[in-house]
């Protein structure tokens, strides 16, 4: 038996010891024409979707399914567009394990690499994290249907369930689910953003977003301009240089790089667990301040790029315009004019539920923060205003009261929950607290919906003990 197999047995034994209460408590339901109705459908099989499934399974919700558009165990960025070498989160994180010591990343890593290996490890390599998530899925028996894309959701009041088109290999089938969890990651409440003034000015083969597939080999000997100073901008700059780019110039608006990490400040129980318990004004003040402080590149990421002679920083250099000048890209910045052969856009993502195909029919009914709260002028932030205004357990709320009450059975466990509930929807660091909050909401919602049936079950209970 391999060390990983022995650890998997230990995990299952630990779960058996903690399995009370074991009785199944949800009655299977079908549609009027006999099609099974899932208790929960989870869209997204990355770390958030898998941990949500595990949390529900521990609460005896087993009639569930996780779908993901990617191949099995390739959900999330780790084996695709993530170009960092390691996670940015410190290795001592916990969260997906849900309090099971044998299921922690440390237990798994030490089982594979031996005693003392954890102490020698700095940050967790991204490929190692992907391997851990695969072990997690296999050990827990989480039902995942890969290469399956969820279409536009619609609520069916007659069935008291969501209709979800699931497309797989060109074939679309309609699934029904009492509850749906969207665990679609950082872009799950919007999409990656390339400003129109860039996409309108350049041919498609002359620019890419950090999220895009990039043929870095084609950049050998070329001049690359990177817009943005976040971690992913530095990751892509370093990758281009490692593939032989002649030079990479990184441009950003601030007068100097951010070198204080507000996310490290936030790593304490009060903020991670209880931001969602604050009032709207306090939530807005905290999150807008974190965003205003900015995102820095981790020290290792900065060194990875700056060790190359061809790497140049341009602070105070917001881009004013750009255009093709023959075969060259001409860039006008606040610090002067520059030229490049290729542009990498590191401007992150935009929050806008209108960009989510699965919410196409629902977006007009979903409450946003701009519908519920007006911040002081000094704290105004357009992107925050577009964040969904979520309930206490990541559920959507209705924009007009009474118009779409069914939205309370649809959960947004994505980065879009940042303003309402803090880190957690797509963040490893907040998962320890966000997962129980989500699971509590779903189990409570299902129990309330079935309350009368449970009461009738109690009245009919007649198991004599002597």
Regions found by a protein language model. Name each.
Residues 48-51, 79-80, 94-95:
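Generic N-terminal leader segments that precede the first folded domain
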Residues 73-83:
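Core mature regions of organelle-targeted
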Residues 84-115, 264-278:
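Flavin (FAD/FMN) cofactor-binding and adjacent substrate-gating region
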């Amino acid at each position: 038996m391999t060390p990983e197999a022995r650890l998997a047995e230990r995990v299952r034994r630990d779960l058996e010891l903690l399995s009370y209460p074991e009785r199944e408590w949800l009655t299977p339901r079908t549609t009027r024409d006999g099609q099974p109705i899932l208790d929960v459908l989870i869209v997204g099989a990355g770390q958030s979707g898998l941990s949500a499934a595990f949390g529900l399974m521990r609460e005896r919700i087993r009639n569930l399914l996780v779908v993901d558009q990617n191949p099995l165990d390739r959900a999330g960025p780790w084996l695709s567009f993530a170009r960092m070498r390691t996670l940015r989160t410190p290795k001592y994180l916990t969260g997906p394990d849900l309090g099971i010591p044998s299921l922690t990343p440390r237990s798994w890593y030490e089982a594979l690499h031996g005693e003392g290996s954890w102490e020698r490890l700095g940050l967790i390599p991204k490929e190692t994290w992907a391997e851990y998530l695969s072990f997690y899925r296999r050990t827990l028996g989480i039902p995942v249907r890969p290469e399956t894309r969820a279409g536009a959701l619609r609520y069916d009041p007659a069935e008291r369930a969501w209709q979800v088109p699931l497309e797989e290999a060109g074939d679309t089938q309609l699934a029904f689910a009492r509850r749906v969890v969207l665990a679609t990651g950082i872009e799950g409440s919007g999409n990656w953003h390339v400003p129109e003034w860039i996409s309108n000015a350049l041919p498609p083969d002359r620019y890419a977003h950090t999220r895009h597939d990039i043929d870095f080999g084609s950049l050998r000997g070329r001049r690359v301009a990177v817009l943005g100073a976040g971690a992913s901008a530095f990751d892509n700059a370093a990758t281009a240089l490692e593939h032989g780019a002649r030079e990479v110039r990184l441009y950003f608006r601030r007068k100097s790089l951010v070198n204080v990490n507000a996310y490290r400040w936030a790593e304490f129980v009060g903020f991670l667990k209880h931001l969602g318990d604050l009032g709207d004004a306090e939530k807005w003040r905290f999150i807008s301040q974190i965003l205003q402080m900015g995102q820095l590149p981790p020290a290792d990421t900065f060194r990875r790029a700056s060790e190359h002679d061809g790497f140049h920083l341009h602070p105070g250099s917001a881009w004013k315009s750009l255009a093709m000048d023959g075969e060259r890209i001409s860039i006008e910045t606040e610090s002067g004019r520059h030229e490049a052969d290729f542009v990498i856009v590191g401007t992150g993502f935009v929050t806008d539920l209108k960009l989510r195909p699965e919410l196409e029919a629902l977006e007009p009914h979903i409450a946003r923060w701009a519908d519920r709260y007006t911040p002081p002028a000094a704290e105004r932030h357009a992107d925050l205003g577009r964040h969904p205004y979520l309930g206490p357990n990541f559920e959507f709320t209705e924009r007009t009261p009474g118009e779409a009450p069914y939205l309370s059975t649809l959960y947004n466990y994505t980065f879009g929950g940042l303003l309402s509930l803090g880190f957690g929807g797509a963040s490893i660091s907040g998962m320890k607290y966000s997962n129980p909050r989500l699971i509590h909401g779903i189990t409570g919602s299902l129990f309330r919906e079935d309350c009368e049936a449970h009461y009738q079950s109690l009245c009919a209970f007649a198991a004599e003990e002597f």
